[in-house]
Amino acid sequence: MQVDPTKGIGLANTSLQFSNGRLHALCEYDLPYVVRLSPEDGDISTVGRIENNVSTKSTTAHPKTDPVTGETFSFSYGPIQPYVTYSRYDCDGKKSGPDVPIFSFKEPSFVHDFAITEHYAVFPDIQIVMKPAEIVRGRRMIGPDLEKVPRLGLLPRYATSDSEMRWFDVPGFNMVHVVNAWEEEGGEVVVIVAPNVSPIENAIDRFDLLHVSVEMARIELKSGSVSRTLLSAENLDFGVIHRGYSGRKSRYAYLGVGDPMPKIRGVVKVDFELAGRGECVVARREFGVGCFGGEPFFVPASSKKSGGEEDDGYVVSYLHDEGKGESSFVVMDARSPELEILAEVVLPRRVPYGFHGLFVTEAELLSQQ
């Protein structure tokens, strides 16, 4: 069997996005694939690879949708200049404005995730870099550069070039995933909450030796200074928030507890308002010996527009008990100090450990094109 790489080689196994009546399966070295989830029996079918309305050869597995405007923001990255290209789409999913090549990336970096705020797109430039020449030497193309100083870059959301981009050195801050970002003080301060990966030299080959602590970084736009506050010293990643607060100031996040990563032995709730006062974990659920979960996901009890509290909802996840060989789906009370399990459904077959998840509502299922 011959494979045409121009028709896609991605596994579409990293993340999921529901947008404009379509469920997208994503990975960062290919374009999105549209899949359809049957509302009747849950059967999944592949519709096809998205090739129109996209001018790059790949897209991030972590696009961001602004819950206020409905716009979606994305990017692609690779080992050839421009190393990162930014793009945006209107609320109907149509390409909006030109792609923006970000030439101020000095070398090809591992840019897995990014953030949006009301006025900016926030990009990390971390100590994991790509060195294509290493392939010729029989070595791995991606690896750490311990001499590099990590940076955060702010690009105006509606920029048409990277001439307005500002970079801020943040030594020791290697942001692979983002929890949320927002603006304060009339837009003069940009706040980013994200796990910080260390030691970075173990990020590719030795996940079991990684420790991922959650930090809050504050960028003062007038002075250019950056301050950091540790929110939790625990080994936490795969953080989620109420999606209605994406890009806007939020208070709570729910993160997986590594045992070590990528296995998740429990979920914690972090309160950002406790920043600067020590450990910010305010709720916890441990899954038990030999029981591990996937990325948690927050499901609001009602929409943000209805005026409910930010944490009024549920945290859901798949679990697998390795001792019993049993998989289940659990629903936890997001407001409970113990993240109390309200419901657990034992599943008829194994659900493998994965990367990122998505909760799709009944209304979204029925709206699929």
Swiss-Prot record:
EC assignment: 1.13.11.84
Class of the enzyme per the UniProt entry, highest EC level: oxidoreductase
Induction: By dehydration.
GO molecular function: carotenoid dioxygenase activity; metal ion binding
Keywords, ordered alphabetically: Chromoplast, Dioxygenase, Iron, Metal-binding, Oxidoreductase, Plastid, Stress response, Transit peptide
Cofactor notes: Binds 1 Fe(2+) ion per subunit.
Principal location: plastid
Catalytic activity from the UniProt record: all-trans-zeaxanthin + 2 O2 = crocetin dialdehyde + 2 3beta-hydroxy-beta-cyclocitral
Names of the cofactor(s): Fe(2+)
Tissues with expression: In the style branches.
Gene Ontology cellular component annotations, sorted alphabetically: chloroplast stroma; chromoplast
Positions annotated to bind Fe cation: H62, H112, H177, H356
Highest taxon of the lineage: Eukaryota
Subcellular localization: Plastid, Chromoplast
Any GO BP: carotene catabolic process
Function recorded in the entry: Cleaves zeaxanthin symmetrically at the 7-8 and 7'-8' double bonds to produce crocetin dialdehyde and hydroxy-beta-cyclocitral, two water-soluble precursors sequestred in vacuoles and involved in the synthesis of saffron pigment and aroma.
Sequence similarity: Belongs to the carotenoid oxygenase family.
Protein name: Zeaxanthin 7,8(7',8')-cleavage dioxygenase, chromoplastic
Gene label: ZCD
